[in-house]
Amino acid sequence: MKLDGYTRLAAVVANPIKHSISPFIHNRAFEATATNGAYVAWEIEASDLAETVANIRRYQMFGINLSMPYKEQVIPYLDKLSDEARLIGAVNTVVNENGNLIGYNTDGKGFFKCLPSFTISGKKMTLLGAGGAAKSILAQAILDGVSQISVFVRSVSMEKTRPYLDKLQEQTGFKVDLCALENVSELQARIAESDLLVNATSVGMDGQSSPVPENIVLPETLLVADIIYQPFETPFLKWARSQGNPAVNGLGMLLYQAAEAFQLWTGKEMPTEEIWQSLTEKYQ
């Protein structure tokens, strides 16, 4: 990578963030597309967020990515939000359009792009969890024409989850069904009629636990996805593959949400296949 007086910056902003794989992905992409850019990780305190956003304009940056805890906190400092960012209520990408700062959320698009030969339009989805990643998948599915969504959370989280689903219905007219994860017969019934089953919880990061009981029977055409990529194959995905179902981990979502951001910043397509190869070598 050659840096000079014309090099434009992009950064990921979060706390903590030094462990991030985003600089690896984006700097590879800058190099592969002969784009004069550099991507760094900025670990900042909340009190520095306003100044950090102001620096996007000040230094004529491409923009920034955001991770926890700043995806929602950044919104008041932006000029405009995309449809999906408004629906999700969180921003993971800020684009500098001639000094106008526009907030996007590329997580949902990245998720659906990483699913092999699958489109969500007209399909039924069962989603486990209702955190940040789940919200982005939910909102994008609705924007892309999903026909039915069943969200399962632990019964203690149902009250906390409902207001967001009500807000989604108010803004889109789409009603999401909310169910308790402990209700195994309901879980089985919903999965049986689904085209896509997604684990958007952190259950499985320990390499031992699974978000669903192993006696659940999966329909043979069901695609199973997990947003976790470390471990590369969670117990949930192993279980799905043992039933003969296609199963996808979260590494593709990480890559394709980055590719969406890269295109918004540069107008260029990220060479995802080439970078995917490097990522799988790193994590497999």
UniProtKB/Swiss-Prot annotation:
> What GO MF annotations does this protein's record show?
NADP binding; shikimate 3-dehydrogenase (NADP+) activity
This entry's Enzyme Commission designation comes to: 1.1.1.25
Keywords, alphabetical: Amino-acid biosynthesis, Aromatic amino acid biosynthesis, NADP, Oxidoreductase
Q: Which residues bind NADP(+)?
A: D83, G129, A130, G131, G132, A133, I227, G250
Kindly list the biological process annotations in GO that this record carries: amino acid biosynthetic process; aromatic amino acid family biosynthetic process; chorismate biosynthetic process; shikimate metabolic process
User: Which residues does the record give as shikimate binding sites?
Assistant: S20, I21, S22, S67, N92, D107, Y229
Q: Which reaction does it catalyse?
A: shikimate + NADP(+) = 3-dehydroshikimate + NADPH + H(+)
In what pathway does it function? Metabolic intermediate biosynthesis; chorismate biosynthesis; chorismate from D-erythrose 4-phosphate and phosphoenolpyruvate: step 4/7
Q: Does the keyword Transcription regulation apply?
A: no
What the entry lists under InterPro entries is as follows: Aminoacid_DH-like_N_sf, NAD(P)-bd_dom_sf, SDH_C, Shikimate_DH, Shikimate_DH-bd_N, Shikimate_DH_fam
Q: Where is the active site?
A: K71 (proton acceptor)
Q: What class of enzyme is it?
A: oxidoreductase
Summarize the subunit comment.
Homodimer.
What's this chain's function?
A: Involved in the biosynthesis of the chorismate, which leads to the biosynthesis of aromatic amino acids. Catalyzes the reversible NADPH linked reduction of 3-dehydroshikimate (DHSA) to yield shikimate (SA).
Family statement: Belongs to the shikimate dehydrogenase family.
PANTHER family given in the database record: BIFUNCTIONAL 3-DEHYDROQUINATE DEHYDRATASE_SHIKIMATE DEHYDROGENASE, CHLOROPLASTIC, SHIKIMATE DEHYDROGENASE
Q: What is this protein called?
A: Shikimate dehydrogenase (NADP(+))
Q: Which organism is it from?
A: Streptococcus pneumoniae (strain JJA)
